Regions:
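Glycine/Thr-rich phosphate-binding loops of Rossmann-like dinucleotide-binding domains
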Residues: 133, 162
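Short glycine/proline- and charge-enriched loop/turn segments
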Residues: 166-174
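Short, well-ordered secondary-structure micro-motifs
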Residues: 96, 164-165
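Short catalytic micro-motifs in class I SAM-dependent methyltransferases
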Residues: 126-131
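Conserved helix-to-beta-strand junction in the class I
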Residues: 143-147
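Conserved beta-strand signature within the Rossmann-like core of class I S-adenosyl-L-methionine
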Residues: 148-158
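C-terminal lobe and adjacent flexible extensions of AdoMet/dcAdoMet transferase-like proteins
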Residues: 218-220
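Conserved N-terminal segment of class I S-adenosyl-L-methionine
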Residues: 1-118, 122-124, 135-142, 158, ...
């Protein structure tokens, strides 16, 4: 993809509406067995992720950006971690457990008015960016860099075989709202341009499943 093609594709992208992420999206029969968003299913899927977040980052205060119904928030809460969440969908708050429901703010993940600067020592953003347009990804990256005082931990789906830095694709066979799979280097570049530096040592610790979908950045 050259710059002209990139520009055209970016202009043509359309954002997914918040209403798409309703109860059917999170818990409906369309999901593969064992992949819905009820707490006990997510507990099995998360495995050691919550404990690793606490161990690797040793956080005082965590923000789960694009938290969905708050399953990771609940699991971190069980470990004694102080955690807030932001999600685009009202259904996320409605489906959350009582322990974390009131800690979820409903709003756009790129909205710079929802939380103060440097309010969290870790901003977590997992399996969110693929649901955004390229322009929304750029805004959300900037917002993460603004809200963190130290670390950003991201997982997302990346382009499986990009021919250039600018290449991005979709993944509608997995989820109809997977509209942006970037080149991994492009996403890293966006964070670097926001004043963050890569932490490959921490990426190796967090990518215990060896899926190649983890980025860890530290605010410079």
């Amino acid at each position: 993809m050259n710059i002209t093609e990139f520009e055209q594709h970016v202009v043509e992208q359309r954002a997914v509406a918040a209403g798409h992420y309703d109860a059917e999206y999170f818990t409906g029969a369309w999901r593969d067995a064992g992949n819905n968003y009820n707490l006990e299913t997510r507990r099995q899927i998360e495995g050691k992720n919550p404990a690793l977040i606490k161990e690797v980052f040793q956080p005082t205060k965590v923000l789960d950006l694009g938290c969905g119904p708050g399953a990771l928030m609940h699991l971190l809460h069980e470990l004694g971690v102080d955690v807030d969440g932001i999600d685009f969908a009202q259904s996320s708050k409605e489906l959350a457990t009582p322990e974390v429901r009131d800690r979820i703010a409903v709003g756009y993940v790129g909205d710079a008015t929802l939380k103060p600067d440097a309010a969290y020592d870790v901003v977590v953003c997992r399996e969110v960016l693929e649901h955004l347009t390229v322009l929304q990804v750029k805004q959300t990256v900037a917002n993460m860099a603004r809200m963190t005082s130290k670390y950003i931990y991201v997982t997302t789906r990346f382009h499986p075989s990009p021919a250039s830095l600018l290449d991005f694709t979709t993944q509608f066979d997995v989820d109809p709202s997977h509209i942006t799979l970037l080149n991994k280097d492009m996403l890293r570049l966006m964070f670097v341009l926001e004043g963050c530096r890569s932490r490959p040592d921490l990426e190796a610790k967090m990518d215990w499943g060896h899926k190649g979908r983890v980025l860890v950045l530290e605010k410079a």
